[in-house]
Amino acid sequence: MSVVNNRVALTNLVSMEALTTEEVLGLINRGSEYKAGKVVISDHQKDLVANLFFENSTRTHKSFEVAEKKLGLTVLDFNADASAVNKGESLYDTVLTMSALGTDICVIRHPEDDYYKELVESPTITASIVNGGDGSGQHPSQCLLDLLTIYEEFGHFEGLKIAIAGDLTHSRVAKSNMQILKRLGAELYFYGPEEWYSEAFNAYGTYIAIDQIIKELDVLMLLRVQHERHDGHQSFSKEGYHQAFGLTQERYQQLKDSAIIMHPAPVNRDVEIADSLVEAPKARIVSQMANGVFVRMAIIEAILNGRNKNS
């Protein structure tokens, strides 16, 4: 792995922990350069990429596809429901097949935590792996677009007061962000239902009631309540959660003028955030979506750089 003039070279991208700080900042800056139209795009038509999504996705799946097409890659169609997965084929054998067919990059989302370990350790699979989200584990590309959004606003991370709020235990976004934001010098706070909080998070920040910290925050990062990962016995109604933990109009008014609101989406309106605030002046939710394309262009480019370096 290396970085020269924001041009990062990676073999795979599976977690934020695997990246150096230099690589993280290089990917953010490269995404910013793509956004500003400062990059001359090479011809990548000979490079093949497959987006293997085994969980539903709109933003991650489609922004990777847009990024790949903007870079000129050949994007292979893959529909899990119409593939041999329905005949019992394993993820490993699916990726082994795609690699054997000459696929250079597999972008994968899968419900199993750490699914990627056997893929990147395989002596036979030559395709590079980009983690588009693994269960409740990691979501590196979402984290990088979040970092770009914060950096665009403040120009730094050191000393920023950032609260990550909501369904912390089940959120791969929270885990990726807390790891790297702590490393970059941000001051982290967590809030949400106690049963959705792990003591392991104490290594990164402080668990606190939202109303104790909201006036001091620079960034409020809301998380989706992940109903699909719960057992159906959570004790909160939609209205009850919103009043106890959500961003209500009253809490919005207490934020600093310079504060920003973030959410990885999809948004449960009137649960994590009041419906009227999704596109409010302090909200950067749409900006996050847009930044996803440029960061993912930087990621795909970095993987191609790594493959060319190692070939």
Swiss-Prot record:
HAMAP family: Asp_carb_tr. It catalyses: carbamoyl phosphate + L-aspartate = N-carbamoyl-L-aspartate + phosphate + H(+). GO terms for molecular function: amino acid binding; aspartate carbamoyltransferase activity. Heterododecamer (2C3:3R2) of six catalytic PyrB chains organized as two trimers (C3), and six regulatory PyrI chains organized as three dimers (R2). Carbamoyl phosphate binds at R59, T60, R109, H139, Q142, A265, P266. The keyword Secreted does not apply. Belongs to the aspartate/ornithine carbamoyltransferase superfamily. ATCase family. Its EC number is 2.1.3.2. Pathway: Pyrimidine metabolism; UMP biosynthesis via de novo pathway; (S)-dihydroorotate from bicarbonate: step 2/3. InterPro entries: Asp/Orn_carbamoyltranf_P-bd, Asp/Orn_carbamoylTrfase, Asp/Orn_carbamoylTrfase_sf, Asp_carbamoyltransf, Asp_carbamoyltransf_Asp/Orn-bd. Coiled coil: none annotated. One of its GO terms (cellular component) is cytosol. Pfam families: OTCace, OTCace_N. One of its GO terms (biological process) is amino acid metabolic process. Gene3D superfamilies: Aspartate/ornithine carbamoyltransferase. L-aspartate binds at K87, R172, R224. It comes from Streptococcus pyogenes serotype M12 (strain MGAS2096). Signal peptide: none annotated. NCBIfam families: asp_carb_tr, PRK00856.1. It comes from the Bacteria. This is Aspartate carbamoyltransferase catalytic subunit. Keywords: Pyrimidine biosynthesis, Transferase. Catalyzes the condensation of carbamoyl phosphate and aspartate to form carbamoyl aspartate and inorganic phosphate, the committed step in the de novo pyrimidine nucleotide biosynthesis pathway. The keyword Chaperone does not apply.
